[in-house]
Design a protein with these regions (language model features):
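Oxidoreductase cofactor-interface core, primarily capturing Rossmann-like NAD(P)-dependent enzymes
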Residues: 2-43, 58-61, 68-72, 78-88, ...
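A hydrophobic C-terminal alpha-helical subdomain
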Residues: 22, 214, 238-239, 248-301
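Acidic/glycine-enriched edge-of-secondary-structure segments
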Residues: 49-52, 81, 192, 300-301
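General small-molecule cofactor/ligand-binding pocket signal
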Residues: 53, 244-248
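Aromatic "clamp/platform" in nucleotide-sugar-dependent glycosyltransferases that forms part
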Residues: 89-93
Length: 301
């Protein structure tokens, strides 16, 4: 096993945190990129055994030292939520990739989103879906291109499905973030893919452990496929306080679902995410079912 560290971006967030935990549990050295080493989340990473390195994806110079000597990079970028229409996500990917290539890093695992391979022009119709959903998907596609064309010896792209964790408060999916009202305008009875965030860590670990096998793999990553109605039924069977589903899209909007989120949800119904559990299983990656996740989430309440 290599003693060179893996540089993990987004380490204090959901995905990066899951990756850091999976690597540490497997005995892989983790270099966690954080903007504020004094934060509580950073402290928990350090206590778990990660080495904290200060850096900011918006500051290319700050990435040089963290990338130096790393065996691989876990790449996960987001938009700037204070300026959703800017190109921060793509630029952050470019900054990280440039620093990693300059440092001689040979492997990258990049996390995108299920469905980012859809090139149907209708999927980017701003008049139909709004400016932000179209921009969001273009950014995901462009960030993937940046990774693929950077010249790493080996690269892997993960396209996770919707997070199971989105159905646990606080979450944007709930009216007011913390209520028990699920603010969705989607079709409640159509099966959709789900992933437990911990499985992103599992998949990343698998790719890092076998770079050649996973080189060029674009994995649509899911642990289960079931409808929103069925997901809520499972959760309500283990929760002390039930989640309330809207009786119709109009009710969800009355609960205060942001228009941009409603547009994104409608797009999801028209262009459903293609990830399915068997895609990960075919590569030997074990995943978490929704029921398994729900019971674990209930225990942590």
């Amino acid at each position: 096993m290599t003693t060179e560290p893996v540089l993990v971006t987004g380490a204090t967030g959901n995905q990066g945190g899951a990756v850091a935990r999976a690597l540490l549990a497997a005995g892989r050295p983790v270099r966690a990129l954080v903007r504020d080493p004094s934060s509580a989340a950073a402290g928990r990473l350090a206590a778990a055994g990660a080495t904290l390195v200060r850096g900011d994806l918006d500051d290319p110079a700050s990435l040089e030292e963290p990338a130096a000597g790393a065996a691989a990079v876990f790449s996960m970028e987001t938009a700037d939520y204070a300026n959703l229409m800017a190109d921060f996500e793509v630029q952050r990917a470019r900054n990280l990739v440039a620093a990693a290539r300059e440092a001689g890093v040979e492997q990258i695992v990049h996390s995108s989103v299920s469905g980012a391979g859809n090139d149907d022009p209708g999927a980017f119709d701003e008049e139909r879906w709004g400016a932000f959903p179209a921009h969001y998907w273009r950014s995901k596609i462009e960030s993937e291109r940046v990774v693929r064309e950077a010249g790493f010896r080996t690269w892997t792209i993960l396209r996770p499905a919707g997070f199971m964790e989105n159905l646990k408060q606080p979450s944007l999916w709930f009216a007011g973030f913390t209520s028990n009202r699920l603010g969705v305008v989607n079709d409640l009875d159509v099966a959709r893919p789900w992933i437990a965030v911990q499985d992103i860590g599992t998949a990343t670990l698998a790719a890092l452990a076998d770079p050649r096998r996973f080189h060029g793999v674009v994995l649509e990553l899911a642990g289960d496929a079931l409808s929103l109605r069925r997901a809520v039924e499972i959760l309500n069977s283990v929760r002390s306080t039930p989640i309330e589903l809207p009786s119709a899209p109009e009710q969800a909007l009355a609960w205060g679902v942001p228009p941009e989120l409603a547009q994104s949800q409608r797009r999801m119904d028209t262009y459903p995410a293609p990830a399915r559990p068997e895609m990960a299983h075919a590569l030997g990656i074990e995943t978490t079912t929704f029921e398994q996740w729900a019971h674990g989430a209930a225990r942590s309440e």
